[in-house]
Every structure is written in C-alpha cells, then in structure tokens.
A protein has these predicted regions:
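Flexible glycine-rich active-site/ligand-binding loops centered on an Asp-His dyad
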Residues: 135-139
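N-terminal intrinsically disordered, cationic/polar leader segments
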Residues: 1-117, 121-123, 127-129
C-alpha cells in the first residue's frame, strides 16, 4: 500500500476524575502502511488549538501507539501496553514532561482503513493529571 488520502474522525475524551470533556475532529489525512503497522498524518487547525502543527499517529504491532506533533507545538507521546514512558507534551503555553501509562490499545486497521482505540493515563511528577480515551476511524 502506498500513501493514500483518507477521511478520519478522531474523538478524544479526557477526565480528571471529576469532569469529563470530549472533542471530535473530522479531517483529511494521509494514511500509509509501515513495516510494523500503520501511520496517519494530519494538519491541526484552530479548532484543535494547535493551528500550524502536523500530527502523526503511528501504530506498532498493535501494542504501541506513538503520537508526534511538529510545527508550532512539538509533542511526542508513547502509549505502550506494559510500559511507562516519560514524554514531552507540548502545549500552546509551553512544554511538560509527562508520564504515560497505557490502559488499552485495540485496532482493526488494515490497508483499507478501520478503527484504532486507545486509553492512557498521564501524570506529572507522579501526580495524576487525567485519563485520556482516543478513538480514530479511518475511511
């Protein structure tokens, strides 16, 4: 499979234990098969708060998801089952070093698209920040 233009729907929800907030993004993206899985790349917009950035979400062997953001805001989050990763999370207000623990990763992505769902917890200096659920549909 070579790179192909696709439509994607990304639903993100986060909870800090008291409040839950959800956002939905519909966007065009570039989808491609890699040696170990699949990669999806899309441009952020004002709606996401990361205008001027490009985000890449890569699935490795169904067990690890790497979310990288480049451009006006730079981030690199690694969500891997059974491992805690310390990652740089860029925000419009500055960068944070965060701990990332995966709770769940499930994918039925194939050469025609599909769905990727993953859940993770973020902490800063071992203090709980929130639970994050991401669901991505590729068509």
């Amino acid at each position: 499979m070579i790179k192909q233009d696709v439509s994607m729907k990304l639903v993100s929800s986060q909870s800090d234990g008291e409040q839950k907030e959800s956002t939905e993004l519909l966007s065009k993206a570039v989808y491609e098969k890699t040696l170990n899985g699949y990669k999806l790349t899309y441009d952020e917009s004002e709606a996401t708060g990361y205008n001027g950035s490009t985000t890449t979400i890569e699935l490795f062997d169904g067990k690890k998801v790497v979310m990288s953001r480049t451009g006006s805001v730079i981030s690199n989050l690694v969500v891997e089952l059974g491992k805690k990763h310390h990652c740089v999370y860029g925000t419009p207000y500055g960068d944070l070093m965060v701990g990332v623990n995966a709770n769940y990763i499930h994918s039925n992505l194939d050469d025609n698209g599909g769905k990727l769902d993953f859940k993770y917890v973020i902490d800063v200096n071992s203090s709980y920040i929130g639970d994050f659920d991401i669901s991505i549909e590729v068509k």
